[in-house]
Curated annotation (Swiss-Prot):
Source domain of life: Bacteria
Pfam families: Ribosomal_L30
Protein name as catalogued: Large ribosomal subunit protein uL30
Gene: rpmD
GO BP, sorted A to Z: translation
Organism ancestry: Bacteria, Pseudomonadati, Chlorobiota, Chlorobiia, Chlorobiales
Family membership: Belongs to the universal ribosomal protein uL30 family.
Subunit structure: Part of the 50S ribosomal subunit.
A GO cellular-component term linked to this record: cytosolic large ribosomal subunit
Length: 62
């Protein structure tokens, strides 16, 4: 496993999103615009980000 992390920032509100997208945002630890979390860079996290890619911004950390 790599020790790389990604920083996920919520840039848009979840108003008008589907239930699946709202649940994904909550499971990532986000909830309001400008909230940030750092998660390990693995396929599971990348899959969650892909579901809500129009709501979040992703930065790779070293």
């Amino acid at each position: 496993m790599s020790d790389k992390n990604i920083r996920i920032t919520q840039v848009r509100s979840i108003i008008g999103c589907t239930k699946k997208q709202k649940a994904t945002i909550k499971s990532l630890g986000l909830g309001r615009p400008n909230y940030q979390v750092e998660k390990p860079d693995n396929p599971c996290t990348r899959g969650q980000v892909k579901v809500v890619q129009h709501i979040v911004k992703v930065e790779e950390l070293s």
